[in-house]
Structure formats: C-alpha cells, structure tokens
C-alpha cells in the first residue's frame, strides 16, 4: 500500500485495526483514524485519505500513489449502479461542500446578435472540380477576379445558457447548431466573418481563455488508434489538469478541521484523488470510464479504419469522455449520441443533468433524435432553424407555445421529433390542430415573430438587456492561463505518450530496419571491394556507393510524411483544446527518433563500410557513420517540417517529391558542381545532400591510401574529387558536419514553428453554381407556395425472388491478441421473412453488427458455428451476395463521383443484364426521390468530414446505392445514425416501402422514436454479451413485446406514452438484471415463445416442394466486358475530377523537366569526355527516377482510398477483381502519355538531343513506359500491404533497389554476377538503356575516356554494356514490364483481403 512518506509512517502508528464484533463503535473508530490524518501538515493532509480494504480495516493512503486495483475498488464502491449511485455520489460531494459554506464557481454564457457568415466561390455550370475546371480557374485568377458570395450560417441569434440548467439545442442538419456551439466556445474558423458578441459571466471572449473555460465536444471522433481507451482518457486528464479542485480541497480541509467535521472516508478519498495534478493514471479516468460504460473496453485500443478497435458507439463515448474528464464545468456538446442506443444516451445525459443540477455546471447539448425520456431531462430548449433561433425558453412550455401557433404534438409522438418536423414544409401540415381554420405554411420567420411577441420571448429579451453582475461570481470561474500544467510536466506527459506510441508501432520500425539491413546487404555485395583499387574509375564506383547510401537514407525519411500527417488531426484538436503547446509535442517526436536514426545509420555503416572497401582507419569509420547519421536526421527533419507546413497528403507528396528532386539535382553527384550553370550554382550550397557528399568524400579521398600522386601532380583522391567538383580541402569534412547539424536544427525549428503558427486544415471551401446562387437569391423574395400533392407516376417494378433466411444456434468466436478464444454470439436462433421488416436491437456492444455480419457473410476472421439457410437451402455466399444488399454503418463511397452517378454505377453492375438502360435510369430517379436526394444528385460525394456530402446525406446515399440493386434481402446497419428525426423518418419510410414489396429487410437501430420503432414488424433483441433476449412480433403499439416483458416477475410496467424501445432496453440492461436478480436470456430460453420460435424456424428451414436452391447462370450480373466498361467509366470520372491527384503530377513533371533542362542546357550537343556523357546520363536518370518516384507516391494514396470502396463492392459481387484492377490500370494510360509528351517537348530541344523523329520517339516511348511502370508498381505495393504506412515503407526499399540497379551508380559491366539478375529485373535499367542507346549507341565520334580515345558507341558498350543493336529487345521488355506489373496488381487485389471483420 502506497504511503506519503515519513509523516504517514508516523500516522500509521496510530492506525486503528478493528475486527468485526469487537464492540467498539464504528463512528469512534472512524474519528480515531481521521485524527491521525488531521495531525498531518496541510499539503500532506489534502493528499492523504482513508481507504477501506474490505477486511473490516482501513489503511491510510497517499492518493498520489494509488495502484490500479485501489482506484477501481474505490470507484466500484462509489458507483455500482450508474443511475442511482452517481446521483448519490454528487449529492454527497455537494453536501460536504455546503457544510463548510463554500460556493462553487459557475459560468453563465450569453450571446447577443450573433451572426456568422462564410464566403463561397461562385462558378458557372456544375460546381465540380474537374481537371479542366481547375486549370481554367487557376488561369482566371491572373486574368479576372473570382466571383464570391456570402452565405449566412447564423443570423443575429441571442440567448443565455444558464448554470445549473441543462439546455438542449435542436434543429435540422444545416441549421447552424455546430457553428453556434463553436462560436460560443471560441473555436470558429478564422475564414468566417463573425458579428455580435459572446460573453462568459459578463466577460468578452477576448478577456480570458474560452477554450480552457469551456469544453467543446466535436462531432468528429479523432483519436490516436494505437492508444487504449484508458490511455486516451489518462492523457487527457493529465493535460487538462484539475482546475480549482486543489484550492477548493484545501479550503474544505481547513474549514472541516475548524468545525471538527469527519467526512465520509470514501468521498474524501475520491475528492482528494481527483484534486492531484499531473498524475499518469487518474481517479477521474476510472470515474468517467464507469459512467460512460467504457469500463468494459478500457484496455482496448481505439483503432481506425485499418486497425481493429472499439465500436463506433464506444468511440463516440470516448470523444465525450476525453473532454469531460477535465475540470471544465461549461460543456458545449455536439451530437454526442451518434451511434449510441437510446438507453445508453439516456444514462449519459442523466449523469450530465445531475452534474448540472448538483454541481452547477453549464451544459448545452445538441442531439439529433433524443428519445422522449431523454428530452424530459432537459430544462431549456433552443430550437434553431435556417440559422435563426425559433424558441429559447423552458422545455416545459414548448408544446404550449406551438399549440398557440396552431400545431399540436400527437399523443404517441416524441416532442423532439415533432419540433424538428413542424418546421419542415413537407411535414408541417400533419400537425395542424385548428381544423376549423384552413392550413397555410408557417415559415421560420413567422414562428420567430410569434415567440418574440410571447411572454417567453419578452422575458428572454428583458434578461438579456440586464448586464451580468460580475460581483456575484467567483474569480476562478474563468480561466486566464492557456495551459494547466507546468512546461516540464507537459513535456513529460507528451514524452510518455510518444514512447508508448513508439512501442505500439515497433513492428513498423523493425520492418523499416529489416528492409534497411536487406538494402545494406545488397549494396555491400554490389560494391564489393570497390575501393580495393585506387584510380579514377574505382573512385567513381566508390562515389556511386556513397550516393546509394545517402539516397537510401533520404528515401528512408519519406514515410515520416505520412506518419506526421496521420497524427496531425489529433494534434490540432488537442492544441486547440490547449492540452499542450506545439513545442511540447514536437520535442519528444524529434528527440525520441534520434536513437532510431543512430541505429539505422550504424547498421548501414557496420554492414557496408569494410565490405565495400573504404579506408580502414577506425576514426574514418566513425566519421563516415556521423555524416550518415546527421544526414539521416536532416532528411527526417525535413520531411517532418514539410508535413507540418503542407498538412494534406497530396500537398505533402508533391512537396516531398520536389524536395527529393532538388536535393538530388543539386547534390553534386547527378551533375557535378563544376558542370552546373553559374547562375544556378547557389543551389548546391542549399542541399543537405551536397554537404553529406562533401563529408563522405573528404573522409575517404583525403585518407593516406589515396595520396599517391598522379601525372597531374595531384593525389589520386584529389583527382577523383576534382572531376566531381567536390575538392574543398581536407578540413571540409567538419564544415560539412557543421552544415548538416545546422540543417537538422533549422528543419526541426521550422517543424515546431509550423505546428505553432500554421492554421489547422479546414473543411474545403464551399463552391456553388451561378444558377443555384441566383435561385437562392430569388427565393428570399418569393412567397411560400401552398403545399400541393405531387401526382405519382407509376413505380418501376422489377422482378425478384422472395427469400427467407433462417439461422439456428449461431455461435461466433474470435481469437484475442493474448491467444485466447472469446465467444461473441451465443446460440442465436431466428428467421428473417419476406415482407417482414425486422429490427435488430440491443445496447452498445450487444453484438448486433456482429450478428448482421455473420448472417450476411461479411466476417473475414473467427469461427462461425450453427446453421444458416436461405429459402430452405444452406447458404452459399457466392449466390447469396447477388440477391442481398448490405448498408454499412460507415458510409464508404468513391469520393470523386456524383450522387446520381453512384446510383447509376450500382444499378449498371448489379441489375440483370437484360434490363434496359431506360428502366435502370427510371429506377435510379425513383430511388433518388424516395430518399430525397434529387436536389443534390449532381453533388460530389467527397470525403467524410473534409468535403462533399454531410453525414446524413452520405447515410441516405448508402441506402440508395443498395436499393437500386433490387435485392431480395437487405441488411442495414444503423441506417438512422447521424440523421435528424425527419431524415430518419424519411429513410425508414423508404425501408418500410421496400419491405412491403415482399423483400426481406433487417436493420440494426439504436435510438428509434416511437413512430420509427413501430414501423417494424418483428424484433430481435440482444443483451450485452451476444445473447438473445427476445425474438418475435411487436404487435400493434408494441403490445406483444410489452406483454412478454411485463409477464416476467419484477419487471416494471411501461409508462403511458413512454417509448417502448427505450423501456425495453432499460429493463434488459446489465444494471437492471443485477437489480432484478435475473438473466433475461435464460428467461427467454425458458419461455413458451422460445419453443414456438424454434418450431417456426425449423419449418422455415425446410425447402418447399418444387423449389430450387439459389443459382445464377453466371457469377456476376454483367459480362466481363460490361464490368470493365462500368469500372473504367467510374475510374475516368474519379481521375478527371481529382485535380489534386493529376494536376500535381503534371506540375511536377513540368518542374522536373524545366529544372533538368536548365541544369543540362544544350549539354547533349557537345560530348568530349566521359564526364560529359555521365552528365547526359544523369539528366536521363533524373527525369526517369524522380518523375517515376512522384507518380508512384501520388497513386498510392488514391489506390488506398479506393481500396476500401473496392472491398465493399467486391463483397456485393458487383464485378470481378480483374475488371476493377484493369480499369484502374487502363485509366492511367492517357495521363501518363500526357506527362510523357510534356516532358519530351520540354527536355528534348532544351538539353540538345539529336533532332531525329526516330530518336525523339524512343525518348517519348521510354519515358511513357517508365511512368506506367512506376504507377503500376505503386498500385502493386498498396495491394501487397495492409495499410498505407506499410506501403510507403516498402516504397523506400523499392526506390533504393531501382536506383541501385539502374546502371547509373554502378554500371552493368561491374555488377557482380550474383546480382546481375537484379539488374535485368529493374525496370529503370531498361528505360535508361533505351534512352542512352537510342541517342548515342550509333554515334562514332571519338571522346576522351579515362585518358584514352574511344568512340561514343564503343564506350557505351565497354562501360555500360549498351548496344544499339539490342534496342528491339529493350522495346519489347519496356512494354512487357507494365503489363506484368499490372497483372500482378490485379492478381493480388483478387487474392489478398486485409479487411478485418
């Protein structure tokens, strides 16, 4: 047991041990023990408490040194049943504070006439960012000013969020809820224009630190995937600090001592434990884990799209917990219930209500679909519509207000759902209650006018007119310090986390080091004893080995771009929350990478130095190592700085590629400094590669063994250096070392400054078409038209086969990381019937999605037991996928096509080939109307949270894509998550209509309103742990399910107008089972309903007479040619509308071509010696290698993004993997050809190559094939690896290999015979041979070569092994390479599946 030190040791001598039944009064024992604590000094007293150990004795403990078991024991004692015990805990804490007369700090938030406007760009035509539109737009910036318009998000809103009260923020998507929350928390983007004022306790936002005073909980769940839930919360608790808790605790302790009050030991221990700052593990973390229901997954990692982790609902709760674990009592929470069931939402909101009412917290929460029970927990409501406040007053008066406006909430309708629908033009009429008066649409402005004229509006206006009395609040209510911790504590916290992340990513670092070892082994054997002979030729080989080492270390830094970008989202969030300053994050990430650089550089030096044959002196060995180390550090620092400045993957890729190009071009090896144009010579001194070359060459060529004098009266070493222009004297080594250290310091300083001052990446700017903008402007002045019923045209009816899915005793097991087997589903039996809409419900973590995945066949791991039948026959996944549709919880779509195109693509590939195009298009149109997407059918889908559709639009698109496939069976995983009540009702009406056509439909659902819940016909209810609690019909008004549960002894009756779904989840949750002392799963198995269901399932599992097993004449609905055409059409749209992908490639090759042309200006016309030919070869090498590297890098992210879409579409049997892969391959051809043409047109005349059509064609052909090869190799590396990080690490090795065996750093003739096969396998060797041989293989001009006279063609054959007669073979190999690599890409895409489900 942890102790406080000497004082506690003395106090322990007074500890009273007591046994049960010893006759001493418990209160006297407690007072006696408490007296020992009271004797301690003040500081020790507030960190010392009594902890009951469970054996009728108490120990004196130091709360700063509590062990995990002790913290959890205390929390379990305080909060066993969350709803009741949390309230009791807060009341006890408040009672203790009130007993000594301490007033807690409170905050009142006011906003007056608050307006927010955003600028958007107006374009003519459709606002789609195609390649042509982007080029046109970029050019127009220089010709004319772009047209912009302003969109009002919030329009003069005013209100008060009061302490001690819970306020609900309601409104449809797009009404400005998120903007209002961000404005109140001081977190609005700098790109928007803000008017009006916001104040806390009468102080404007500029007078204090609002980000620390209030806590804003975003809709986006951004977490570090490698950290567990507990680690995430512990870090947040540590960084947010304790606020004024310690000061309050000291004052409580002082006053209690004066009044001789003995507090409850458990309450005292808890309050003291959460009042200690900077702890690695916090008691507050255990408390938040408990009340948010995250204690069951506390040690599970957060995970992400590519790594397994917690569920979506748990991630949403983690986002909430990360903020509320801090000391702030002003909470602004944005849609915290997404992905949560209604029972869990009620529990969390109930805890927040208790915090507001008892602790005086100020809480404003926006919710999309609050259940009636959750809605009743709020004190006030702010109703937003069209950026304006319609109602801002007590919740209890809101129905009365709308009745006064002529609208009444129906009896079995949730008030929150009614409030969101009553503002809708399409839904308003059904709530009109003045039947004697004709209905006409009442606009938002009319509601606002009525509210302002009401007594409620008058009271709000009157309160706002009175200034806040600052004398009535505590000084510490507001925060005036940016950071809670000292600089040292912040650095320690960030360092601890960085070390943990490095441990979690150890496989990636080991993988990188393993590849480095492989590269080193290859390099040392390629350059085996290259330095054994000291002459100009072998000196050139040694230079090549040095360049290879430096290039490998340069490429080794490239993955740092992706790693840094991947963490920037979480960093930006935490920086905005003032968890820590940028330097506290930067310093650990810089320093802790140094040991890895030391290891990698040392491995390379140890393996290669003596084998290659460098100077054998030990001192020179270590000096060689030091240069490699400082260069490696400078490269990693440079890429880190680039990532912190550019912030997006596309910008980082192009900037990183340009940086590598510049470093190599001006590094002194590709083109010697002496050969560079004078006016570009300054570039040499700005390249870290130059200084690394200077350092390595000075270390080697000024060594004693290179001091042999040559005919020119200079040493052999100086002769080699003179040829390369690197002879800067013996002491240039230390100059180079100092320069490299300077680069390391400069880039790391730049990285830190960019993190500090660079604005966070924002959501892409809005673009609106000119026509749409004019339409919006005109509608502002048009009267609202009467609602007229639209004549319904005949619906598109497509044939389908009704199918029943039965499942008996289904069990599912997975293997845990510890090697144990864990069962997730227990003996699940049921049936999904045609024409029946089935709801699959349960609390978060009950196994709903797991069961849906098992039934649909989406699981890629684990063991499934039991029987699943379709139409009475055993399920065959290949045919089942053709007749079923699956709407995923996470909306995965191709980002660069429109909404309508997404549906057309799905219909094209999934509907039978005999259905004509007209029928398909009519079906697409009908589905668009059904899910109300017709208004945005021409909108780009975009990336979630970055561009394109909103969450609810994306959700409707997911459903629409499946509906157009005309499936017999539809699985929907949480189709209403992220939707408001109206959108959810629209979606569920569409789903119900689909079920009524005779299709089999099942969907999981978390927070159904009464209306939505009662649209279902049957219910499958699961409890936590994957066990079945109920399967059967709902009945009218849920009568059958209510009757079943009410028949169980001890279950409370459902209240009038209560949502049966919420009631059902409440009574079957774990705490309710504990309270009732029963197991609902066992109760179901013992019921007659279970026996009846077993009989029904057995009957449905038998095939009917005359029926046949599901079969199709072909594996896919379309022919192979049809699949290829459809996939190619989508890939064309995706490429054409992705300028960030293709335009950057075009810009890079233009820049590369121009730079090479300027550096090698007209050098091809005057070849006099081997160095002139080496320089020309260097120009070819630069164009081929670096243009290829850039293409390879940029295509990888595109393929990785589209691969997730590919997995979804392949599962649906939309197409063959080969059709998808070859469409991806073919779409690259025109873009690569365009790049090749641009490169050839620029480079060929400027460098001065022979102006021959034949030679020019060879140049174009070689570059074109080279770009294709690199593109396809990038695709292949993505196909071979589970995530982009691994692919990028593999890319570094690939670059090193194609560089080493290109024939540039080591010619073919000198490559050892055991590695010559690698030369022939390297595509760059063939490309360079084709370029050089076609230009000079037939040139008979004599040149000076290492002191001899030889013809150019003879030198090419003698030194490089290039023959002009071999060009036919080269031409064949060049076209064979892309075909082979493309085929390998297609093969591995079809065989490998890294999706873990």
Swiss-Prot record:
May be a general defense protein. It is a multi-pass membrane protein. Belongs to the ABC transporter superfamily. ABCG family. PDR (TC 3.A.1.205) subfamily. It holds the Pfam family ABC2_membrane_7. It is found in: Membrane. The chain crosses the membrane at residues 507-527, 549-570, 594-614, 625-645, 651-671, 735-755, 1141-1161, 1173-1193, 1229-1249, 1260-1280, 1286-1306, 1314-1334, 1369-1389. ATP 2 binds at residues 842-849. Keywords: ATP-binding, Membrane, Nucleotide-binding, Repeat, Transmembrane, Transmembrane helix, Transport. It comes from Arabidopsis thaliana (Mouse-ear cress). InterPro entries: AAA+_ATPase, ABC2_TM, ABC_transporter-like_ATP-bd, ABCG_dom, ABCG_PDR_2, P-loop_NTPase, PDR_assoc. Residues 489-701, 1122-1336 form the ABC transmembrane type-2 domain. The keyword Transmembrane helix applies. One of its GO terms (molecular function) is ABC-type transporter activity. Residues 138-411, 805-1050 form the ABC transporter domain. ATP 1 binds at residues 171-178. One of its GO terms (cellular component) is plasma membrane. This is ABC transporter G family member 41. PANTHER family: ATP-BINDING CASSETTE TRANSPORTER. The gene is ABCG41. Gene3D superfamilies: P-loop containing nucleotide triphosphate hydrolases. Confined to roots.
């Amino acid at each position: 047991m942890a102790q406080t030190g000497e004082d506690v040791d003395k106090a322990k001598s007074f500890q009273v041990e007591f046994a049960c039944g010893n006759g001493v009064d418990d209160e006297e024992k407690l007072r006696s023990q408490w007296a020992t604590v009271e004797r301690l000094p003040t500081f020790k007293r507030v960190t010392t408490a009594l902890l009951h150990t469970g054996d009728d004795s108490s120990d004196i403990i130091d709360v700063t040194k509590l062990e995990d078991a002790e913290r959890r024991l205390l929390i379990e004692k305080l909060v066993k049943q969350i709803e009741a015990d949390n309230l009791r805990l807060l009341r006890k804490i408040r009672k203790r504070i009130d007993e000594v007369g301490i007033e807690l700090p409170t905050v009142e938030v006011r906003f007056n006439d608050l307006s927010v406007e955003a600028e958007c760009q107006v374009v003519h035509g459709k606002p789609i960012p195609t390649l042509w539109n982007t080029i046109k737009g970029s050019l127009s910036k220089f010709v004319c000013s772009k047209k912009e318009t302003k969109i009002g998000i919030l329009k003069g809103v005013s209100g008060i969020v009061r302490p001690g009260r819970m306020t609900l923020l309601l409104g449809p998507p797009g009404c400005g809820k998120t903007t209002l929350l961000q404005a109140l928390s001081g977190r609005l983007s700098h790109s928007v224009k803000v008017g009006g004022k916001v104040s806390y306790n009468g102080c404007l936002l500029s007078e204090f630190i609002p980000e620390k005073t209030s806590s804003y909980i975003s809709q986006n769940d951004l977490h570090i995937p490698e950290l567990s839930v507990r680690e995430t919360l512990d870090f947040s608790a540590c960084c947010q600090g304790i606020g004024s808790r310690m000061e309050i605790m000291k004052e409580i302790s002082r006053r209690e001592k004066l009044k001789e009050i003995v507090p409850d030991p458990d309450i005292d221990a808890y309050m003291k434990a959460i009042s200690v700052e900077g702890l690695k593990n916090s008691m507050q973390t255990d408390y938040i884990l408990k009340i948010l229901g995250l204690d069951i997954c506390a040690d599970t990692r957060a995970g992400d799209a590519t790594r397994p982790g917690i569920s979506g609902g748990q991630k949403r709760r983690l986002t909430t917990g990360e903020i509320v674990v801090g000391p702030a009592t002003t909470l602004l929470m944005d849609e915290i219930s997404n992905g949560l069931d209604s029972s869990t939402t009620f529990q969390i909101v109930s805890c927040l209500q208790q915090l507001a009412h008892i602790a005086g917290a100020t809480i404003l929460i926006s919710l999309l679909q609050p259940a009636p029970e959750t809605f009743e927990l709020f004190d006030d409501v702010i109703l937003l519509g069209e950026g304006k406040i319609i109602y801002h007053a007590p919740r209890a008066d809101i129905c009365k207000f709308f009745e006064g406006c002529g609208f009444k909430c129906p009896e079995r309708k949730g008030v929150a759902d009614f409030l969101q629908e009553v503002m809708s033009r399409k839904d308003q009429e059904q709530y009109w209650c003045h039947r004697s008066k004709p209905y006409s649409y009442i606009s938002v402005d009319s509601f606002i006018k009525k509210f302002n004229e009401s007594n409620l509006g008058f009271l709000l206006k009157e309160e706002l007119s009175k200034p806040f009395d600052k004398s009535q609040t505590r000084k510490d209510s507001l925060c005036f310090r940016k950071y809670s911790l000292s600089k040292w504590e912040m650095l320690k916290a960030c360092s601890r986390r960085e070390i943990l992340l490095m441990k979690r990513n150890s496989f990636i670092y080991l993988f990188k080091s393993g590849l480095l070892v492989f590269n080193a082994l290859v390099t040392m054997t390629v350059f085996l004893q290259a330095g054994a002979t000291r002459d100009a030729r072998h000196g050139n080989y040694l230079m090549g080995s040095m360049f290879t080492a430096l290039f490998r270390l340069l490429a080794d830094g490239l993955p740092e771009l992706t790693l840094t970008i991947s963490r920037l989202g979480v960093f930006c969030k935490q920086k905005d929350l003032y968890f820590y300053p940028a330097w506290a994050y930067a310093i650990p990430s810089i320093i802790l990478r140094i040991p890895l650089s030391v290891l990698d550089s040392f491995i390379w030096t140890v393996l290669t130095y003596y084998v290659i044959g460098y100077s054998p002196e030990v001192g020179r060995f270590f000096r060689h190592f030091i240069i490699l180390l400082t260069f490696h550090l400078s490269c990693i620092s440079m890429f880190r700085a680039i990532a912190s400045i550019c912030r997006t993957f596309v910008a980082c890729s192009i900037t990183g590629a340009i940086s590598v190009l510049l470093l190599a071009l001006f590094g002194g090896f590709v083109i010697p400094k002496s050969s560079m144009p004078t006016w570009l010579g300054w570039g040499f001194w700005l390249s870290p590669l130059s200084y690394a070359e200077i350092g390595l060459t000075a270390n080697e060529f000024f060594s004693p063994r290179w001091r042999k004098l040559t005919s020119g009266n200079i040493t052999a070493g100086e002769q080699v250096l003179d040829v390369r222009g690197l002879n800067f004297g013996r002491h240039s080594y230390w100059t180079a070392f100092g320069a490299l250290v300077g680069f390391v310091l400069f880039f790391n300083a730049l990285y830190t400054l960019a993190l500090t001052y660079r604005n966070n990446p924002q959501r892409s700017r809005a673009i609106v078409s000119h026509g749409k903008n004019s339409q919006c402007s005109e509608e502002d002045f048009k009267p609202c038209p009467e609602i007229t019923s639209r004549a319904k045209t005949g619906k598109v009816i497509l044939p389908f086969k009704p199918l029943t899915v039965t499942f008996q005793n289904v069990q599912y097991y997975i293997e845990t990381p510890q090697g144990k087997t864990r069962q997730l589903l227990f003996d699940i039996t049921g049936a999904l019937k045609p024409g029946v809409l089935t709801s699959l419900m349960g609390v978060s973590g009950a196994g709903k999605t797991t069961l849906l995945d098992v039934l649909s066949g989406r699981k890629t791991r684990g063991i499934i037991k039991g029987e699943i039948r379709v139409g009475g026959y055993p399920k065959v996944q290949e045919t089942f996928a053709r007749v079923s549709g699956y709407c995923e919880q996470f909306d995965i779509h191709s980002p660069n096509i429109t909404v309508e195109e997404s549906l057309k693509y799905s219909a094209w590939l999934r509907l039978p080939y005999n259905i004509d195009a007209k029928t398909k298009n009519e079906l697409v149109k009908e589905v668009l109307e059904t899910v109300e997407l017709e208004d945005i059918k021409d909108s780009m889908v975009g990336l979630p949270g970055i561009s394109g559709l909103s969450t609810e639009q994306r959700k409707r698109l997911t459903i629409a894509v499946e509906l157009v496939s005309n499936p017999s069976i539809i699985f929907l995983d949480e189709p209403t998550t992220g939707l408001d009540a109206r959108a959810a009702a629209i979606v569920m009406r569409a789903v119900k209509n689909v079920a009524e056509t005779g299709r089999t439909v099942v969907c999981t659902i978390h927070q159904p309103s009464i209306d939505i819940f009662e649209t279902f016909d049957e219910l499958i209810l699961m409890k936590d742990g994957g066990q079945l609690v109920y399967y059967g019909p709902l009945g009218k008004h849920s009568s059958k399910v209510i009757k079943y549960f009410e028949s169980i002894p001890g279950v409370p009756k459902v209240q009038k107008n209560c949502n049966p779904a919420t009631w059902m989840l409440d009574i079957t949750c774990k705490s309710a089972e504990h309270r009732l002392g029963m197991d609902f799963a066992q109760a179901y198995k013992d019921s007659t309903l279970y026996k009846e269901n077993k009989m029904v399932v057995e009957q449905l599992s038998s095939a009917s007479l005359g029926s046949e097993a599901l079969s199709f004449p072909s594996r896919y609905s379309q022919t192979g040619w049809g699949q290829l055409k459809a996939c190619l059409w989508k890939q064309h749209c995706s490429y054409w509308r992705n300028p960030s992908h293709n335009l950057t490639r075009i810009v890079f090759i233009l820049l590369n071509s121009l730079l090479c042309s300027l550096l090698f200006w007209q050098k091809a016309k005057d070849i006099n010696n081997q160095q002139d030919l080496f320089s020309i070869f260097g120009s070819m090498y630069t164009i081929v290698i670096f243009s290829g590297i850039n293409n390879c890098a940029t295509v990888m992210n595109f393929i990785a993004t589209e691969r997730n879409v590919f997995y979804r579409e392949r599962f649906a049997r939309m197409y063959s993997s080969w059709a998808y892969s070859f469409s991806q391959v073919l779409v690259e051809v025109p873009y690569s050809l365009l790049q090749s043409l641009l490169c050839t047109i620029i480079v060929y005349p400027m460098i001065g190559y022979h102006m021959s059509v034949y030679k020019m064609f060879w140049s174009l052909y070689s570059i074109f094939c080279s770009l294709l090869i690199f593109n396809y190799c990038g695709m292949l590396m993505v196909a071979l690896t589970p995530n982009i990080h691994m692919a990028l690490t593999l890319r570094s090795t690939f670059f090193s290999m194609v560089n080493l065996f290109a024939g540039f750093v080591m010619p073919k003739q000198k490559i050892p015979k055991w590695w010559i096969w690698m030369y022939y396998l390297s595509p760059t060797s063939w490309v360079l041979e084709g370029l050089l041989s076609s230009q000079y293989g037939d040139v008979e001009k004599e040149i000076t070569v290492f002191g001899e006279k030889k013809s150019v063609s003879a030198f090419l054959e003698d030194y490089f092994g290039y023959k002009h007669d071999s060009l036919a073979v080269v031409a064949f190999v060049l076209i064979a390479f892309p075909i082979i690599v493309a085929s390998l890409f297609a093969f591995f895409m079809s065989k490998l599946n890294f999706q873990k489900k």
